[in-house]
Amino acid sequence: MPIKIPDQLPAREVLVREGVSVMDEKTALRQDIRPLQIGLLNLMPNKIRTETQFARLIGASPLQVELTLVRIGNHKAKNTPEDHLITFYETWEEVAPRKFDGFIVTGAPIELLPYEDVTYWNEMTRILDWTTSHVHSSFFICWGAMAAAWHFHGIPKHTLDKKAFGVFRHRNNAPASPYLAGFSDDLALPVSRWTEVRTADIPANSGLEMLMDSDETGPCLLAEAAGNRLYMFNHIEYDSTSLKEEYDRDVAAGVPIEVPHEYYPGNDPTRPPLNRWRSHAHLLFGNWINQVYQTTPYDLDKIGRNLEHALS
């Protein structure tokens, strides 16, 4: 089944061109099926680009998914047209009464700020608490993952001496995990962050399982069965040119930045970069959606009533 998104959403044209199965709203209404309800709290500056990246991965699932785009209510976006936000997004306050099978929280380029200095931190903590009662399975990305790890487990983030930037090798530590079905033992993933969480800071009794990590960039993917949560500290959703655009932006602005690690062929930024993580990105999101489908209650109202129910 395809992903259901608004007919006029800019991502639709991109996804159709790429061959992703997209369902129009009229067709979705005719089908006698309950689509999975997935929310995307988009904290990235370029919201159109980010919503397209996640819709691409979600839309590859054979299950019908209805994607709801969500934004912080008290934060004014500077890089996305206001009419786009009004047309396609709901504030968290507007969706708070609803239940979701899955909910994704993206990264945000604010990792060097202490959490308490983030202008929307109070709302963010309310959202994180809300996921425990209104979401069957949560998927946190990069800064979103660090914020959730801090909020739920007190795991701090640490500032790096230099930006972890490029494509780095990662270990598959849990090949039997349903989230990593089909994954290679060793894989390359994009990383772009100034901070990190450290394995030594993860409480022994936290119930967090290290699914993937890297000798160079540390923890990558944690799973928490008791809370139905995934914490992805890297940008597996990035498309082929995301790191290039970040690099070109910093070079143009005169910001000291190294060439992204193992991203360009021969580390030559004049050559087109290679995407070596695309298949694993599709696998991870497909596996997550499949797990959500198998374990979520058919009646959305039952989500949150049994907090001990967990993905296995």
UniProtKB/Swiss-Prot annotation:
Coarse class of the protein's main subcellular location: cytoplasm
The domain of life for this entry's organism is Bacteria
Biological process (GO) annotations held by this record are: L-methionine biosynthetic process from homoserine via O-succinyl-L-homoserine and cystathionine
User: What does UniProt give as GO cellular component?
Assistant: cytoplasm
Q: Which UniProt keywords apply?
A: Acyltransferase, Amino-acid biosynthesis, Cytoplasm, Methionine biosynthesis, Transferase
Q: Which GO terms describe its molecular function?
A: homoserine O-acetyltransferase activity; homoserine O-succinyltransferase activity
Q: Where is this site: Important for substrate specificity?
A: S192
Named in its record, the pathway it takes part in is: Amino-acid biosynthesis; L-methionine biosynthesis via de novo pathway; O-acetyl-L-homoserine from L-homoserine: step 1/1
Q: Where in the cell is it found?
A: Cytoplasm
Q: Where does substrate bind?
A: K163, S192, R249
Catalysed reaction(s) here are: L-homoserine + acetyl-CoA = O-acetyl-L-homoserine + CoA
Positions bearing the site annotation: Important for acyl-CoA specificity:
E111
Q: What is its EC number?
A: 2.3.1.31
Q: Which residues form the active site?
A: C142, H235, E237
Matches recorded under Pfam families = HTS (PF04204)
Known InterPro entries for this protein? Class_I_gatase-like, HST_MetA, MetA_family
Family (UniProt): Belongs to the MetA family.
Q: What does this protein do?
A: Transfers an acetyl group from acetyl-CoA to L-homoserine, forming acetyl-L-homoserine.
Q: Which NCBIfam families match?
A: metA
Q: From the Swiss-Prot or TrEMBL record, give the protein name.
A: Homoserine O-acetyltransferase
User: Which gene is transcribed and translated to give this protein?
Assistant: metAA
